[in-house]
């Protein structure tokens, strides 16, 4: 069998359902040192970002007693909040450019939405701003890897940032901040799984 390029191997891996990935490792990709280094470095980076999001979720819980989504089932955030899709990262019609672009677009969107969390938790300004910087840096890392793999990239310039969402009242702001963090955590978990499965090849 001829060796797979990193792009083709990436497409085959992420094109399979998550359950199938454990049974069909592609050893061909393991020899690409730079690609594996990228994966391991950014797995650690993503884990660090997830930890920071969890710390802010605990702050929302401690400050506003908003701790679980079950408690807020009947409360709809106002306005509708970002829920960035990552469906292209684990479907059979996978395209590497689309998966990585979805991750980058989601990081871009959540970076902007975190402005609402910044207003909600002024005592945690440093952590929120660090989280925004880390999201931007992770997006930049992925863009660089896309370029290294010869994938098409979409430029997401900082000057085109969207303003953070605004809310109709204090309680809606608290609920909105809660769901921004919860949605971001789910997004990061999915992105983390994609990188982790690739790193296990």
From Swiss-Prot:
Principal location: secreted
Signal peptide extent: 1-23
Superkingdom, natural source: Eukaryota
Cellular component, GO, one term: extracellular space
Family of the protein in this entry: Belongs to the IL-6 superfamily.
Residues carrying a glycan: 123, 137
Entry annotated with the keyword Lipid metabolism: no
InterPro entries: 4_helix_cytokine-like_core (IPR009079), GCSF/MGF (IPR040117), IL-6/GCSF/MGF (IPR030474), IL6/GCSF/MGF_CS (IPR030473)
GO biological process, one term: positive regulation of cell population proliferation
Subcellular location: Secreted
Species this chain originates from: Gallus gallus (Chicken)
RNA-binding found in the keyword field: no
Protein name according to UniProt: Myelomonocytic growth factor
Keywords of the record: Disulfide bond, Glycoprotein, Growth factor, Secreted, Signal
